[in-house]
Regions:
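Acidic helix-start/capping segments at beta-turn-to-alpha-helix junctions
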Residues: 25-31, 74-76, 120-124
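Glycine-rich catalytic cores of cysteine/serine-nucleophile enzymes that process amide/ester linkages
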Residues: 69, 73-88, 162-206
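Short, functionally critical alpha-helical segments immediately adjacent to catalytic or ligand/cofactor-binding
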Residues: 26, 56-58, 98, 158-163
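N-terminal capping segments
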Residues: 38-111
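...with weaker cross-activation on analogous glycine-rich loops/strands in unrelated enzymes
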Residues: 107-192
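Long, low-complexity intrinsically disordered regions
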Residues: 209-216
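Soluble non-cytosolic domains of exported or imported proteins
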Residues: 3-8, 24-27, 47-51, 87-95, ...
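Short acidic, glycine/serine/threonine-rich helix-capping segments at coil-helix boundaries
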Residues: 1-45
Length: 216
């Protein structure tokens, strides 16, 4: 195709690409353009904190403490994300969430201070202090159970869910039609105990949730 000023335009593009500016749209020019476009399309997209937390949590499924001690090589790493002594044995469901947040925000520019609490319900206090900084607390839980429009808060994938029985986990999907939500939790077991000793995927009744914390 020919048009006035075509050669100068091609030269300008070639200079931007860092190749010989001869004004000819030959194979070298087109290959350079193709390689640059291909490279841009293959760059990984930046993921959200919630997405990173879910992916991290899934990769930790199966981690267990040693002999019911609330301790173990990986478990102690979770506990080190809190302000308590990781070498001592104590319930670590909240520590697991602290660890997920810490790892997910690494190399990300965030306004909030990361949680370091070992208490499940104390996560609500942390969230209140960080509201307006990329953290939102939804409580009472009745406000979030039934989505009616796009503006209504709702349990989403990557939300931190605080349970009524002093336990905490991470939602890995939206509530299902059976009234349950899939979660990944630390310090639980097959029976759903809050002191079960492993990182597992669970299905919890939405009615057992007392609050939801969303990080954006």
């Amino acid at each position: 195709m020919r048009f006035s000023g075509k050669r100068e335009l091609i030269k300008s593009v070639q200079r931007e690409l860092g190749i010989l500016a001869d004004g000819l749209d030959g194979p070298v020019t087109w290959k350079t353009i193709y390689d640059q476009v291909k490279g841009e399309s293959e760059k990984p997209s930046s993921s959200s904190i919630a997405e990173d937390m879910v992916n991290l949590a899934k990769s930790e499924i199966g981690v267990s403490e040693i002999d019911g001690t609330n301790c173990g090589p990986r478990v102690d790493e979770y506990k080190a994300a809190t302000w308590l002594d990781p070498d001592k044995g104590w319930p670590w469901c909240a520590a697991f969430i602290c660890w997920l947040v810490r790892e997910a925000i690494e190399n990300k520019d965030v306004d909030f201070k990361r949680p370091q609490t070992a208490g499940a319900w104390d996560f609500e206090n942390w969230a209140r202090k960080q509201e307006g900084k990329g953290v939102a607390l939804y409580k009472p839980v009745g406000e979030i159970l039934n989505r009616q429009d796009n503006d209504r808060p709702y349990i989403r994938k990557g939300d931190i869910v605080v349970f009524r029985f002093s336990h905490i986990g991470l939602a890995i999907g939206e509530p299902m039609s059976n009234g349950h939500v899939a979660t990944i939790e630390g310090n639980t077991n097959g029976a759903g105990s809050r002191e079960g000793g492993s990182v597992l995927e669970k299905s919890r009744r939405v009615s057992s949730i007392r609050s939801v914390i969303r990080i954006s």
